[in-house]
């Protein structure tokens, strides 16, 4: 069986689609094939066909913390945003990989469950958030994840415990082994619904005030080096507001790179490399990217 056979069976598969339509940066080249599975069964079929036909496979969630190079991606790209069910039982919330982190956090809040307030403004998907152990305002996914259901590249379903996920700062096991996150279950604490929602609305207001939400952006680009803060280093190095092509280090929040109009992925990457070079020269600190960079050069 081949990919186009699955298309005939009703799986949503497109060809030669610009990924800039889906990324938060509004940049990125074309996907050779692009699929939007609507069920775990469809994901399993797609993975099996790519394995049997030796087709390269790339998994994407909400594409919020992602830069796709201008040459695009060969093989099949699966976007999981149509897998978005969120279920609540007792003190646990289970969300599909494509469910938005924000929607999951607010669903928990409306059920009077506390623990995901930190995630109220994180724009990514559950799969991506678990993949990178996303965090904000002092909280991280690893603090609330109870278990993660995955599909291995070999086609096996597994469930990992929190410990087995090997979470660390902006890292998890699935970054290393290539397993595909299908859903995650969060263990939360009963609380006062109105107080939880008030705190989430406060954090969202703070985010809008501090972050350049008015421009396309992939969020915070760099991991925080131990003992240092990226934003102040960029400001002191005279790099805030620096622009390469259409990509600019935000004048509102140093360390966020925004698309001021017409930016390419190459603009983003050239600006990232410039910032890394200058920070290394001035502070002898290596800045590592938090944002995921994939695809091929044009």
UniProtKB/Swiss-Prot annotation:
Its EC number is 1.3.1.98. It is found in: Cytoplasm. The keyword NADP applies. GO terms for biological process: cell division; cell wall organization; peptidoglycan biosynthetic process; regulation of cell shape. SUPFAM superfamilies: FAD-binding/transporter-associated domain-like, Uridine diphospho-N-Acetylenolpyruvylglucosamine reductase, MurB, C-terminal domain. One of its GO terms (molecular function) is FAD binding. It comes from the Bacteria. Gene3D superfamilies: 3.30.465.10, UDP-N-acetylenolpyruvoylglucosamine reductase, C-terminal domain, Uridine Diphospho-n-acetylenolpyruvylglucosamine Reductase, domain 2. GO terms for cellular component: cytosol. The active site is at 170, 220 (proton donor), 290. Keywords: Cell cycle, Cell division, Cell shape, Cell wall biogenesis/degradation, Cytoplasm, FAD, Flavoprotein, NADP, Oxidoreductase, Peptidoglycan synthesis. Pathway: Cell wall biogenesis; peptidoglycan biosynthesis. InterPro entries: FAD-bd_PCMH, FAD-bd_PCMH-like_sf, FAD-bd_PCMH_sub1, FAD-bd_PCMH_sub2, MurB, MurB_C, MurB_C_sf, Oxid_FAD_bind_N. PROSITE patterns: FAD_PCMH. Belongs to the MurB family. HAMAP family: MurB (MF_00037). NCBIfam families: murB, PRK13905.1. Cell wall formation. This is UDP-N-acetylenolpyruvoylglucosamine reductase. It comes from Lactobacillus helveticus (strain DPC 4571). The lineage of its organism: Bacteria, Bacillati, Bacillota, Bacilli, Lactobacillales.
């Amino acid at each position: 069986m081949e990919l186009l056979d699955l298309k005939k069976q009703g799986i949503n598969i497109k060809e030669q689609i610009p990924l800039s339509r889906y990324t938060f940066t509004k940049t990125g080249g074309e996907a050779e094939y692009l699929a939007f599975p609507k069920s775990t069964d469809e994901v399993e079929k797609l993975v099996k066909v790519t394995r049997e036909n030796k087709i390269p496979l790339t998994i994407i969630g909400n594409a919020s913390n992602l830069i796709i190079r201008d040459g695009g991606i060969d093989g099949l790209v699966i976007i999981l945003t149509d897998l978005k069910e969120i279920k609540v039982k007792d003190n646990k919330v289970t969300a599909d990989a494509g469910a938005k982190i924000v929607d999951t956090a607010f669903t928990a809040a409306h059920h009077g469950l506390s623990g995901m307030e930190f995630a109220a403004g994180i724009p990514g998907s559950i799969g991506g958030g678990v993949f990178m152990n996303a965090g904000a305002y002092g909280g991280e996914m690893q603090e609330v994840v109870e278990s993660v259901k995955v599909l291995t590249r070999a086609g096996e379903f597994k469930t990992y415990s929190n410990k087995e996920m090997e979470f660390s700062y902006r890292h998890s096991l699935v970054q290393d082994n290539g397993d595909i996150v299908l859903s995650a279950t969060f263990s939360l604490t009963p609380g006062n619904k109105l107080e939880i929602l008030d705190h989430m609305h406060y954090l969202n207001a703070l985010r809008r005030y501090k972050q350049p939400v008015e421009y396309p952006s992939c969020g915070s680009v760099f991991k925080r080096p131990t003992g240092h803060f990226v934003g102040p280093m960029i400001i002191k190095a005279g790099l805030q507001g620096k622009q390469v092509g259409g990509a600019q280090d935000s004048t509102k929040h140093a360390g966020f790179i925004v698309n001021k109009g017409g930016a390419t992925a190459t603009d983003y990457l050239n600006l990232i490399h410039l910032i890394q070079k200058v920070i290394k020269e001035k502070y002898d600190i290596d800045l590592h990217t938090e944002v995921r960079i994939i695809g091929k050069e044009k």
